[in-house]
């Protein structure tokens, strides 16, 4: 098998739409009969995923792999940075934690990771037909270029042709694209094979004069004007929109606590698809109101976020509602918070040795450690309202939780998972709603509690829904992008 061809998508800024455009290209190439795989040398995100072999990677490349119809593989994202503070991150290399680093330390040493990047890339290149590479931020960050391993620095390492994407929805797209090109070195400009304007609303004809001027000034072709596509696909850049989401048209109200270090918000995306279940994020006691369900999500810093709950008044409001019978479900860090105590004997979670009082809603005790559990798991829900629901998800957490109450679920070997006490539920399982069975059971239970008939609420299985959204995305991008030019940039003929 010959070595894979490649195409790289770089952007004028964060949020330009690189991730979704890469997902679209992965889907298009797969539809064209090619084995496509995504690649991003370094990703910074709080949302992560555990592969079948128990390794951790960024979810953006997971989504792109799903779009391509291939199994997510840690080689697709060899370096993952998970921010733990404003100036530091947990550094994960080849799916395993390498340690905590301040930004300045990582910047000085990251070139040492180039062999890991190239080994992962070269291995994928031996198996795939096309590699769709995603850059990060902007290639024109002149203060970072000397040590670049994710934009033009990576493009040079793997000899990748580049599409440069600008976001017109936020305005100034011509300045974005022209300014980025002008700040690049000549050899970097030569790598750019086309400019793409993304998230356009309106009549393309109005843009034509500007496109011609842009081509004249940059000496580069505009190979596509991609419309603003209304697709529901997991996207790190869409988090801000989701956090502002308010759905008051559905009869059931689920309130997700908007923790400062919120991670894996994707756990709750399947709930948004249920026709009876409205999902919203809340960040203070006033916003909480009187929901039908409270969801306490995962977090990159359980201790700090528990203290935040206390300081902002949400702890008091949550405890009052729980005492009145409002169901509360905590996932991962949220599960840990629901317990009696959280013990950090080495300071691995909070930076100092301490034992913290939990919310006291579950008979559990958590002890943090440096060791991280990473595993894909299957389980069957044991909690009475949802008993029998089959789950497929993953665990990714530090700390061990001892539970004295009833389990939330059982593993296939009979082992206990999570904890239940009355109307309060806790679990370590991320992705617990993806199969749809728990979503249906949960919504049905909430409907019965409220006297609502759930029989007319048909839920599309998440996997099928995801496929539909990928196809909508691919159709929209294929219709807007000059795919002949994209194939030519890779040295291939269009399929």
Q: Which residues does each predicted region cover?
A:
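Catalytic nucleophile serine of serine hydrolases
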Residues: 332
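Conserved P-loop NTPase catalytic core
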Residues: 348-375
């Amino acid at each position: 098998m010959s070595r894979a061809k490649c195409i790289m998508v770089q952007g004028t800024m964060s949020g330009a739409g690189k991730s979704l455009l890469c997902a679209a290209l992965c889907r298009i190439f797969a539809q064209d009969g090619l084995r496509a795989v995504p690649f991003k040398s370094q990703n910074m995100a709080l949302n992560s995923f555990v592969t079948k072999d128990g390794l951790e990677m960024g979810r953006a490349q997971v989504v792109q792999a799903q779009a391509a119809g291939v199994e997510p593989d840690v080689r697709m994202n060899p370096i993952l940075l998970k921010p733990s503070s404003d100036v530091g991150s947990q550094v994960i290399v080849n799916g395993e934690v390498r340690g905590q680093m301040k930004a300045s330390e990582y910047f000085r040493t990251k070139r040492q990771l180039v062999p890991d990047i190239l080994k992962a890339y070269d291995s994928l290149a031996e198996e795939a037909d096309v590699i769709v590479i995603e850059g990060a931020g902007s290639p024109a960050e002149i203060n970072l270029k000397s040590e670049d391993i994710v934009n033009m620095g990576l493009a040079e390492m793997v000899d990748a042709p580049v599409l440069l994407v600008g976001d017109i929805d936020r305005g100034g797209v011509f300045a974005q694209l022209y300014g980025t090109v002008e700040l690049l070195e000549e050899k970097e400009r030569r790598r750019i094979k086309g400019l793409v304007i993304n998230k356009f609303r309106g009549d393309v004809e109005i843009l034509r004069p500007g496109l011609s001027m842009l081509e004249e000034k940059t000496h580069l072709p505009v190979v596509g004007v991609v419309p603003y596509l209304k697709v529901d696909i997991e996207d790190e850049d869409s988090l801000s929109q989701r956090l502002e989401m308010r759905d008051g048209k559905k009869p059931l109200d689920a309130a997700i606590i908007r923790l400062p270090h919120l991670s894996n918000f994707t756990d709750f995306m399947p709930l948004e698809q249920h026709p009876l279940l409205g999902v919203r994020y809340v960040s203070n006691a006033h916003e909480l109101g009187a929901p039908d369900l409270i969801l306490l999500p995962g977090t990159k810093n359980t201790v700090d976020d528990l203290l935040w709950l206390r300081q902002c008044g949400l702890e008091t409001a949550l405890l009052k509602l729980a005492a009145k019978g409002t169901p509360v479900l905590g996932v991962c860090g949220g599960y840990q918070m629901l317990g009696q105590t959280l013990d950090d004997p080495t300071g691995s979670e909070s930076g100092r040795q301490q034992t913290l009082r939990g919310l006291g809603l579950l008979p559990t005790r958590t002890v943090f450690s440096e060791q991280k559990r990473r595993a894909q798991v299957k389980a069957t829900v044991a909690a009475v309202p949802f008993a029998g629901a089959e789950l497929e998800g993953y665990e990714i957490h530090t700390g061990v939780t001892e539970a004295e109450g009833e389990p939330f679920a059982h593993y296939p070997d009979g082992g206990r998972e999570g904890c239940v006490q009355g109307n309060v539920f806790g679990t370590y399982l991320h992705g617990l709603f993806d199969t749809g069975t728990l979503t249906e059971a949960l919504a049905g239970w909430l409907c019965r509690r409220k006297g609502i008939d759930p029989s007319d609420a048909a839920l599309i299985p998440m996997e099928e829904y995801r496929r539909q959204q990928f196809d909508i995305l691919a159709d929209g991008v294929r219709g807007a992008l000059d795919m002949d030019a994209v194939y030519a940039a890779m040295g291939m003929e269009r399929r």
